[in-house]
């Protein structure tokens, strides 16, 4: 009798790459050099997450045949690459704004909690052979983490150029999560 629970070679390749990307993102965020600026700290901790999203999308595009999921991944990858460029361009201005010590502590505490929850949820997605389902379930907590961190940063004074980037991230990532959940629901796949 055949074991129907075995992971396919395609799923194994996808998952191995996924976990490498997740581990690299966690290391990149952890290694970010923090300063006395919430704006700076948000940017240097967000860039590894945006780069990871691009790699997650490319990983899916290597194996997916689902046109709708592929188009979503292509859009997300393009937007995330643009976000990295915009954040890197804003970094010099962000460095000019020094944040009060209390604000720094409060922001960083919340950002760390959000990141830990995101990593846990991304790592806890049940493994399976439907890589499109895996991708959507893995990317939803990534989007939620980005949205929550952007909302948190907006509670404090940030550089003038960063504020519109944060509002855009909240809007875009909220829409993307809605689209991903709708894709899962339309196909009869559960979101968790």
Task: Please provide the spans of the model-predicted regions.
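All-alpha RGS (Regulator of G-protein Signaling) helical domain and cognate RGS-like helical scaffolds
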Residues: 1-192
């Amino acid at each position: 009798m055949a074991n129907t629970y075995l992971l396919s070679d395609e799923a194994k390749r996808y998952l191995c790459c996924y976990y490498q990307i997740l581990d690299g993102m966690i290391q990149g965020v952890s290694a970010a050099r923090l300063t006395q600026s919430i704006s700076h700290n948000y940017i240097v901790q967000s860039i590894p997450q945006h780069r990871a999203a691009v790699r997650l999308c490319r990983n899916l595009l290597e194996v997916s045949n689902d046109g709708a999921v592929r188009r979503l991944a292509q859009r997300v990858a393009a937007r995330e690459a643009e976000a990295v460029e915009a954040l890197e361009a804003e970094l010099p201005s962000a460095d000019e704004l020094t944040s009060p010590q209390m604000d720094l502590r409060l922001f960083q505490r919340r950002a760390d909690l959000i990141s830990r929850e995101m990593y846990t949820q991304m790592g806890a997605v049940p493994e399976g052979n439907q890589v499109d389902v895996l991708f959507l379930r893995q990317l939803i907590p990534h989007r939620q983490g980005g949205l929550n961190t952007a909302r948190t940063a907006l509670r404090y004074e940030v550089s003038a150029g960063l504020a519109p980037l944060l509002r855009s991230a909240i809007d875009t990532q909220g829409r993307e999560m809605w689209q991903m959940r709708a894709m899962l629901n339309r196909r009869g796949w559960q979101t968790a």
